[in-house]
């Protein structure tokens, strides 16, 4: 799984223009709708140097999207083609305190660097600039507590590099005990909450290691943006008479983890929340209970949520009706999904 909901972004530089995914757009819809925005590359680089906000080039009255929050990172990279994904395999390594050491052997022979965690936008772009200055040949960047960036001079080569990294970092998902249908059925009866249609979600409640990891805190920004600052949990034994108030009082969460039983979903859960939860589940299923993890600090989480996180979430959720059938699709042919059409990457050249 390379992307979930509207996360991940791609770009291509053509004749001085940086074509970048619009904020809130879903890569899974790249063949069905316009998702790219044209940016003047020279102006974008200058804006990054000044620490300003990058604006789209107004070459069309139909451009109503904001550039991706990662536009600054794409602008400072010298490569013609850039693919940034939230690969569940990469993230499972990128959340580890010993991630650099663990990846050294797996990525041997590739030109890669580990980028310490930095908030998306100008701070992350600065870290990328420093990395490129250290080693200009770098074309694979592992973003701590975030994801993966691969780069190249043409679409085909960049796609193949992405696949190569995925093969090297692949981790088998840990099996999990079956959910307790009696307990979950009781929740549905008293609260109206829904049983997930994606069985792996139950691992968050039935797999001891997954639950422990989940309770530890926020592993990466999209988790906080779409799913909240902590996972809502219920003990395996609870008073059914108090259940409805627990799940519906105030602002109810989009999901609840029932310890040793499974997971239930709020009927109002959005496609973006669902896709993010599936991605989170697949990450923790690939993370060993004994792994030394590096969770985001309170300050880092607050910065994510308060500085653009809510707006990013709102933009992503405006796409939920169109994306209901493709919320968590893999990009099977990245050249197609990245650049919307052959117009942006003609014949893969």
Report residues per predicted region:
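Residues immediately within or flanking Cys/His clusters that coordinate Zn2+
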Residues: 342
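Glycine-rich flexible loops
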Residues: 1-329
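Short, intrinsically disordered C-terminal tails of secreted or membrane-associated proteins
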Residues: 346-347
């Amino acid at each position: 799984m390379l992307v979930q909901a509207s996360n991940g972004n791609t770009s291509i530089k053509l004749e001085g223009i940086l074509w970048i995914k619009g904020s809130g757009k879903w890569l899974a819809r790249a063949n069905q709708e316009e998702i790219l925005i044209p940016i003047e590359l020279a102006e974008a680089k200058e804006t990054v140097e000044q620490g300003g906000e990058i604006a789209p080039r107004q070459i069309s009255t139909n451009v109503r999207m904001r550039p991706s929050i990662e536009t600054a990172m794409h602008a400072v990279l010298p490569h013609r083609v850039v693919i940034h994904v939230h690969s569940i395999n990469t993230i499972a390594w990128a959340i580890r305190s010993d991630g650099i050491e663990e990846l050294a052997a797996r990525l041997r022979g590739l030109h890669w660097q580990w980028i310490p965690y930095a908030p998306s936008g100008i701070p992350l772009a600065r870290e990328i600039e420093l990395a490129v200055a250290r080693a200009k040949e770098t074309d694979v960047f592992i973003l701590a507590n975030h994801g993966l960036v691969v780069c190249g001079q043409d679409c085909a080569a960049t796609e193949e590099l992405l696949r190569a990294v995925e093969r090297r970092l692949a981790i088998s998902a840990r099996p999990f005990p079956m959910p307790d249908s009696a307990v979950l059925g009781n929740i549905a009866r008293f609260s109206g909450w829904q049983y997930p249609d994606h069985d792996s979600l139950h691992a968050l409640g039935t797999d001891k290691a997954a639950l422990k990891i989940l309770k530890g805190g926020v592993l990466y920004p999209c988790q906080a943006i779409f799913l909240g600052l902590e996972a809502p949990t219920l003990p395996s034994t609870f008073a059914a008479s108090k259940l409805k108030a627990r799940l519906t009082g105030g602002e109810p969460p989009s999901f609840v983890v029932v310890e040793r039983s499974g997971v239930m979903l709020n009927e109002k859960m959005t496609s973006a929340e669902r896709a993010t939860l599936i991605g989170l589940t697949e990450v923790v299923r690939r993370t060993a209970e004994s792994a030394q993890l590096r969770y985001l600090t309170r300050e880092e989480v607050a910065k994510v949520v308060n500085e653009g996180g809510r707006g990013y979430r709102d933009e992503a959720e405006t796409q939920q009706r169109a994306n209901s059938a493709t919320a968590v699709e893999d990009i099977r042919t990245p050249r197609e999904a990245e650049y919307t059409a052959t117009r942006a990457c003609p014949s893969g050249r």
